[in-house]
Curated annotation (Swiss-Prot):
Name of protein: Photosystem II extrinsic protein O
InterPro entries tied to this protein: OMP/PagP_b-brl, PsbO
Signal peptide region: 1-28
Endoplasmic reticulum as UniProt keyword: no
Upper taxonomic lineage: Bacteria, Bacillati, Cyanobacteriota, Cyanophyceae, Oscillatoriophycideae
General function of this protein: One of the extrinsic, lumenal subunits of photosystem II (PSII), which stabilize and protect the oxygen-evolving complex. PSII is a light-driven water plastoquinone oxidoreductase, using light energy to abstract electrons from H(2)O, generating a proton gradient subsequently used for ATP formation. Required for dimerization of PSII and for binding of PsbQ to PSII.
Length: 275
C-alpha cells in the first residue's frame, strides 16, 4: 500500500515536470514555419517570431548608408490605462487592463528604412504594413476602453555614437494615431461625420450642443514609443527586443476625452543593407 502511494506521487511529479518543460518550446514557435491548418484557431498567428535567448551579436552600420527593415512585428503583452484619482490629493496612475480582443492585437509585416548620420544617430522610418489594430481592454471596475493600437509614420531615433545595431540600442520617437472610427461610421442614433443624420434630438435648435454628441469628429492623436533591442543575429540580420508605447484611446468620434493607454510587449524585425 505504501509502495502504491509512493508510485502515484512519483508519477505525478514526473507529469508536472513534463508539463513545465513543454511550456517553453510551445511559446517559442515561429508562425512562419507552420502551415495554415497548423495555425488555424490556435492564436499562433498573433505571435511574433523569436530569436534565441543566447544571441548577442551586432550588425555594422555606416553613415550615409540606407538599411531596409522587413517583417517588423510588435506583439503586445501588457496593457495599462491612466485613471484619474477619486481624491484630488492623489495623482493619476496607470491601472492594468484585461484584454478583450482575441487573436488580432499584433502589428506585423511592417516595413521601413534605417539611416545613420555622421554623429552616429540611427533613425528608423516606418513606411507601411499591417500597422494598426483596434483593441479593447477592460478595467477592474468594468469600464471598457477601446483604442487604435498603431505606430503609423513612426520616426524613431537613437542617441549619437552608434556604429552598429547591438543589444544596447534604443529607438525612441513619435507616431500618428488615427481615429478609432471612420468618417462614415454611424452611431446607434444614425449620426455620423460624412453621412447619416445631423442630430437625433426633437428640437433642431439644440443640434449643435456638445452634450448630445451631435458634432462628430475624427481627430488625429499622437503617441510615443521606445523600441529597445535586446537580441541581434548578425548572420541572419534579425533583431528582437521589447517595446513600451503610450498613446491616446478612442474619443467616440469626438464625444469624449481620450485617456492615456500604455502598451508593453516584444518586437521582431529583419535588417538588410540597401542593394
Amino acid at each position: 500500500m505504501r509502495f502504491r502511494t509512493l508510485l502515484i506521487a512519483f508519477l505525478a511529479l514526473c507529469l508536472g515536470l513534463i508539463t513545465a518543460c513543454s511550456e517553453g518550446p510551445a511559446n517559442a514557435v515561429n508562425p512562419q514555419d507552420l502551415t495554415y491548418d497548423e495555425i488555424l484557431n490556435t492564436g499562433l498567428a498573433n505571435k511574433c517570431p523569436q530569436i534565441s535567448e543566447f544571441t548577442r551579436g551586432s550588425i555594422p552600420i555606416e553613415p550615409g548608408q540606407t538599411y531596409f527593415v522587413d517583417d517588423l512585428c510588435l506583439e503586445p503583452q501588457e496593457y495599462f490605462v491612466k485613471e484619474e484619482p477619486v481624491n484630488k490629493r492623489q495623482e493619476a496612475e496607470y491601472v492594468p487592463g484585461k484584454l478583450l480582443t482575441r487573436y488580432t492585437t499584433s502589428l506585423e509585416q511592417i516595413s521601413g528604412k534605417i539611416t545613420v548620420d555622421e554623429d552616429g544617430v540611427v533613425t528608423f522610418y516606418e513606411e507601411g504594413g499591417i500597422d494598426f489594430q483596434p483593441v479593447t481592454v477592460q478595467l477592474p471596475g468594468g469600464e471598457q476602453v477601446p483604442f487604435f493600437f498603431t505606430i503609423k509614420n513612426l520616426v524613431g531615433k537613437t542617441e549619437p555614437g552608434f556604429s552598429s545595431i547591438n543589444s544596447s540600442i534604443d529607438f525612441e520617437g513619435d507616431f500618428r494615431v488615427p481615429s478609432y472610427r471612420g468618417a462614415t461610421f454611424l452611431d446607434p442614433k444614425g449620426r455620423g461625420l460624412a453621412t447619416g443624420y445631423d442630430n437625433a434630438v426633437a428640437l433642431p435648435a439644440t443640434a449643435d450642443k456638445e452634450d448630445y454628441a451631435n458634432v462628430k469628429q475624427t481627430p488625429i492623436g499622437k503617441g510615443s514609443i521606445s523600441l529597445q533591442v535586446t537580441k541581434v543575429d548578425q548572420a541572419t540580420g534579425e533583431i528582437a527586443g521589447v517595446f513600451d508605447s503610450e498613446q491616446p484611446s478612442d474619443t467616440d468620434l469626438g464625444a469624449k476625452e481620450p485617456v492615456e493607454v500604455k502598451i508593453r510587449g516584444i518586437f521582431y524585425a529583419r535588417v538588410t543593407p540597401e542593394a
